[in-house]
């Protein structure tokens, strides 16, 4: 499941209230969400990133507001569950791609996302 732009508290509330049910009902293996506007409508904080993971998001993508909240830089460097835009400089914090084990495990065909 790919979730478009999660915007502010209203967007986070919808994810918190509906995501786990959707994942169960539709047997979804992976949830990727764009969260570049999840913190007050612009940017992402480490705390909100952690909440999204608890709600059932597997991977967060970011966009042009990646660095709007400077406190996300440590999370970009440390977490395997967040990807910044790939077209930024290689010197920018974080990575523009992520490879994660999927439901079939890392050795099975298609077992990564």
Language-model region placement:
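Acidic, metal/ion-coordinating pockets
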Residues: 1-113
């Amino acid at each position: 499941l790919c979730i478009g732009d999660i915007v502010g508290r209203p967007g986070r509330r919808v994810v918190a209230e509906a995501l786990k049910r959707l994942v169960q009902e539709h047997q979804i293996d992976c949830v990727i969400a764009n969260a570049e506007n999840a913190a007050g409508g612009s940017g992402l904080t480490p705390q909100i990133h952690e909440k999204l993971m608890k709600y059932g998001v597997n991977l967060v993508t970011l966009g042009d507001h990646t660095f709007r909240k400077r406190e996300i830089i440590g999370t970009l460097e440390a977490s395997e569950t967040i990807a910044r835009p790939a077209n930024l400089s290689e010197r920018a914090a974080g990575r523009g791609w992520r490879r994660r084990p999927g439901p079939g495990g890392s050795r099975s065909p298609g077992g990564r996302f």
